[in-house]
Amino acid sequence: MVKEPNGVTRTMRRIRRIHFVGIGGAGMCGIAEVLLNLGYEVSGSDLKASAVTERLEKFGAQIFIGHQAENADGADVLVVSSAINRANPEVASALERRIPVVPRAEMLAELMRYRHGIAVAGTHGKTTTTSLIASVFAAGGLDPTFVIGGRLNAAGTNAQLGASRYLVAEADESDASFLHLQPMVAVVTNIDADHMATYGGDFNKLKKTFVEFLHNLPFYGLAVMCVDDPVVREILPQIARPTVTYGLSEDADVRAINIRQEGMRTWFTVLRPEREPLDVSVNMPGLHNVLNSLATIVIATDEGISDEAIVQGLSGFQGVGRRFQVYGELQVEGGSVMLVDDYGHHPREVAAVIKAIRGGWPERRLVMVYQPHRYTRTRDLYEDFVQVLGEANVLLLMEVYPAGEEPIPGADSRQLCHSIRQRGQLDPIYFERDADLAPLVKPLLRAGDILLCQGAGDVGGLAPQLIKNPLFAGKGGKGA
């Protein structure tokens, strides 16, 4: 029997078994977990087992390793990510048998349809902002359902079924699938030139798609928009929905002043219309996280959450996996090095993290291990990468994570090393994806350094390995 939270209409009443093709993906596993908790039968396939598939299996999902037509036998609907095409044997078999095959975002839209949906869109900051909203709502006693692209450290998962009518989720523009969503509240954090293949290389088309997404709101909904971003500011006059703006700009409806950062913690004062100034702090570094917090405060205030709960939810926020996640200290001669892991894979995200490190730890050197993600992104944003990566004190560049793409001449890590070296300020070190990083990086480290491992590919496995490596006599720490 499918269970629904109080006040939520039961959905998909003709559907019993739901099969996910690519169930281990960040965008897929959260939806699968919520559906399992609602009482649906869930199965799924992926190319390899992982901690994610093992977790879903413990919750009752049937997991298949590898893609075969028979995996989907008995399914009433297939859910696919944008990485799965019609030639996939499970998809081909379902289409032949006239079983519905729906994109991930359409299934998310079904979960959101009869709930008070809060969708967070934007090129950068979606995961952290969605996580902050879920945390503040929980602090306010609203117990939301959430589906997030990263693991919320406090919950130990990236998805959870709540008892209230609220559902908080990321809205993915990478394949324009966020157009399936019809939320009550939508956030746009920023709009940048990324995933341009989806939009035929046309930035105007990307902007128009964000406008279309915001007009999926009902006429009584709410658009929450960051006016510090020039593109968001540009599209603002086109939005015919109730709107609240936020940012550091003086004309923002909700803005932050008196910003101060010490290490991981950032303090600031929030100014809101017809409200007393609110002093808050968040256990995350950087101005970008002040903006993520402001979006959260706008929505929490609009939903009637008390200032006390807002302050508590932000102050106690334990972060998200791979978003400036502090693993602990690596022991080196004369002291230790702080080890940080981060998912940032766009020059703007890299710049935000470097700025946060310089702001919170101004006396420390930054030793950076970076892996570009996709050859197309490296090609399209090449000069931006050269500029921002050159701001590290020491740089090691791992070969590009292809994400299924074929190599593009001149858009790889060797060429990036060459271009950065030509600027004359830094001598980057190139290494292959299967190289052992520990003996390579240890001679480069000094006591007091910050070692940042950053990128969206398999670079994400390096920090967990380094903290356990006997070369560093590592002392583990909690994620930030």
Swiss-Prot record:
Gene: murC
Protein family (similarity comment): Belongs to the MurCDEF family.
Compartment(s): Cytoplasm
Primary subcellular site in the record, as a coarse category: cytoplasm
Protein name: UDP-N-acetylmuramate--L-alanine ligase
GO MF annotation terms: ATP binding; UDP-N-acetylmuramate-L-alanine ligase activity
Superkingdom per UniProt: Bacteria
Keyword Transmembrane helix: no
Major enzyme class: ligase
Binding-site list for ATP: G122, T123, H124, G125, K126, T127, T128
Reactions performed catalytically: UDP-N-acetyl-alpha-D-muramate + L-alanine + ATP = UDP-N-acetyl-alpha-D-muramoyl-L-alanine + ADP + phosphate + H(+)
Pathway: Cell wall biogenesis; peptidoglycan biosynthesis
